[in-house]
Structure formats: structure tokens, C-alpha cells
A protein has these predicted regions:
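Short, polar N-cap/turn motifs at the start of nucleic acid-interacting alpha helices
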Residues: 161-167, 242-243, 263-282, 310, ...
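Short, basic (Lys/Arg/His-rich) helix/loop patches that form interaction surfaces
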Residues: 129-132, 229-270
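C-terminal secondary-structure termini that scaffold catalytic or DNA-interacting sites
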Residues: 199, 207-215, 298-314
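Basic, Lys/Arg- and aromatic-enriched nucleic-acid-binding interface segment
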Residues: 94-152
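N-terminal core-binding DNA-recognition domain of tyrosine recombinases/integrases
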Residues: 9-22, 31-108, 123-127
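Catalytic-site neighborhood detector that most strongly recognizes the C-terminal catalytic loop/helix
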Residues: 111, 172-176, 272-297
């Protein structure tokens, strides 16, 4: 019968050959977690049961994995299992993954509060000894926010041909959805400041050098992302932010700011290129309770003003 570890390695290799290096990386990380849990070099799909999966979930949590990481590993393994079933190489077990967590949690708030936003968008003084790399990270963060919370991966892979006049047109790498963003004058200033000066490079920004779709380009992207997040962490410490600053923060902050501006979640979803409005709602969920509380306070304040002097309610 088909062996799990062997099959997952084959799937990961196939993904890499197709140029899906990020997905291949997730599959290998999931596989390493599975090997650490089962303690065997390989095993068959027949050995996988609801109890086995629950044990894997408990094992991951005991290692300090977040619920979202647990979900990623389990969903990855479920995809591998389904592929094996489709090939007739693994037995179909109804509701095999029913007892384990495969959802998405929003326990951790990634968006900036108003006070932190003011700090991040304020101009840094180079005379105060702030490193150039930190200033650059701040301005790229502001640019990503200005481009409707563009993910760093999409920024890195933007091509010069994607920019026409003051409009950037591109496809989201995660969902493949086409997006068109009109640049504000402020965003255009930042684009011109950091755009690639190498005439032989197809990329709009000098974050990558190798040809798109190659393993080298993926490695360059990973290094650029790691460096960007390191500089953002330093920026957050320098500004005394209440929450950690990362590449994700620009995207989540744009979504929640739009939400507080009374923009419909459907429009926010379209603007961000989400695969569905459900993804957008995951971004907004942590802030709905506060917005509902604010709405309740507005109602109560209105009632208080209306009945002042005629009610025992004080």
C-alpha cells in the first residue's frame, strides 16, 4: 500500500517542479511535523484514524503551535489524503477529519490602532540616527497600505509592465484574481523613489533578481521578506508600538480601516482580491464586537439625551 511520507515527498516535489515553491514549503513543513509525531520513517494511510489525527493535533499544540498552524498542517495532510483517495491508493474514511481543527482563528489582532497608525505614518527624522533600512521599510509599508493593503509577495513580483501611467494592474499570486489600483500622488512619489533603476530587470522594485518561477527567485523573495519583517520589528520598537509590526499589518490595517469607514465588506473583499467574502470576514471579525459596542453606546447616548430630566436613568 501507498506510504504517507513517500507520497507527501512526491507531491511536494511535483509542486516545486510546477513552480509552486511556497506551497511545496508548506507541504514539507507539514511532513516534518508528521514525522516528528509518528516517530517512524514511513507508514500507510490505513494507519491514519480519527484518533491518530486527534493525537497529531494534541502533539502540535503541546509543541506551542498556534491553532492556525495546526489547521494549516491538518488541511495540508487532508489534501494529500484526498489526492491519495482519488488515485485509489488510500481507503476512503467518511468524516476522517471531523474531530480535528481545520478552520481559521482570529485570536491575534494584526491591525494597527489609531495611535499606532499615526506613529507609523509620521515622517522619521534621519538626523536622529534611524538606519536607512528602517526608513525604507517604513515607506514600503506605507506604500503597501496605499495600494489597498497589497501583500509583500505581490509587491516583490510586480513588473515594470504592470505600471501604466498612474495605474498598477496585476494578478494576486495567492488567488490569481486580477486587480487594478489607481495610485494616489503620495503613492506615486514612493513608487518613483524605490522603483528599479536596472533597465535589464523586468521587476518594478529591486527586491528580486532571478527569473520569475525559479527556485532562486523564491529564495530571494524569502530573504527580502525576512529582512523587511526584521526592519519593521525594529521600526515598531523604535516607535514604541503597542503591537508587533509585520508585513501582514499593512493589509489587515487597510481592511479594518475600510470597515470603520463604513465600506461594505463585499467592496473590501473585491478591493483586496480575496477569493471570497468569507476571507474578508476573517480579517474583520476581531473588530466587530468593538464596533457593535460602539453602536450600542451611540444608541444609549441618544436615549439619554432624549429623556434627560424625565427619567430615573442616570
Amino acid at each position: 500500500m501507498l506510504k504517507v511520507v513517500t507520497f507527501m515527498k512526491q507531491v511536494a516535489t511535483g509542486l516545486q517542479v510546477e513552480g509552486n515553491f511556497g506551497t511545496a514549503h508548506v507541504y514539507r513543513s507539514s511532513l516534518n511535523a508528521i514525522i516528528a509525531y509518528c516517530g517512524k520513517a514511513d507508514f500507510t494511510f490505513e494507519e491514519v484514524s480519527p484518533e491518530w489525527l486527534k493525537g497529531f493535533e494534541i502533539h502540535l499544540r503541546s509543541r506551542g503551535c498556534s491553532w492556525n498552524t495546526v489547521s494549516t498542517y491538518l488541511r495540508t495532510f487532508r489534501a494529500v489524503y484526498n489526492r491519495a483517495v482519488d488515485l485509489g491508493k488510500a481507503p476512503y474514511v467518511p468524516h476522517l477529519f471531523r474531530s480535528v481543527y481545520t478552520g481559521t482563528r482570529t485570536d491575534h489582532k494584526r491591525a494597527l490602532c489609531d495611535e499606532d497608525m499615526k506613529k507609523v505614518f509620521a515622517k522619521l527624522s534621519r538626523t536622529s540616527g534611524v538606519p536607512f533600512a528602517v526608513c525604507q521599510a517604513q515607506e514600503l509599508f506605507i506604500l503597501m497600505f496605499s495600494l489597498r493593503g497589497m501583500p509583500f509577495v505581490d509587491l516583490a513580483y510586480l513588473r515594470k509592465s504592470d505600471l501604466r501611467d498612474n495605474v498598477i494592474t496585476y494578478r494576486r499570486r495567492k488567488t490569481g484574481r486580477p486587480l487594478s489600483v489607481t495610485l494616489t500622488p503620495e503613492a506615486m512619489i514612493l513608487v518613483k523613489k524605490y522603483m528599479n533603476r536596472d533597465p535589464s530587470s523586468p521587476y518594478l522594485f529591486p527586491l528580486l533578481k532571478s527569473r520569475e518561477g525559479t527556485k532562486e527567485a523564491y529564495r530571494e523573495y524569502q530573504l527580502a521578506l525576512r529582512s523587511f519583517n526584521q526592519q519593521l520589528m525594529l521600526l515598531g520598537e523604535l516607535l514604541g508600538l503597542s503591537d508587533k509590526l509585520s508585513s501582514y499589518t499593512a493589509r489587515h490595517t487597510w481592511a479594518t480601516t475600510a470597515y470603520y469607514c463604513e465600506i461594505h465588506p463585499g467592496i473590501i473583499s473585491e478591493a483586496m482580491g480575496h477569493s471570497s467574502i468569507t476571507v474578508t470576514e476573517t480579517y474583520l471579525k476581531p473588530f466587530r464586537s468593538k464596533k457593535i459596542d460602539d453602536a450600542n453606546k451611540q444608541v444609549l447616548d441618544f436615549v439619554k439625551r432624549s429623556i434627560v430630566g424625565v427619567s430615573a436613568w442616570k
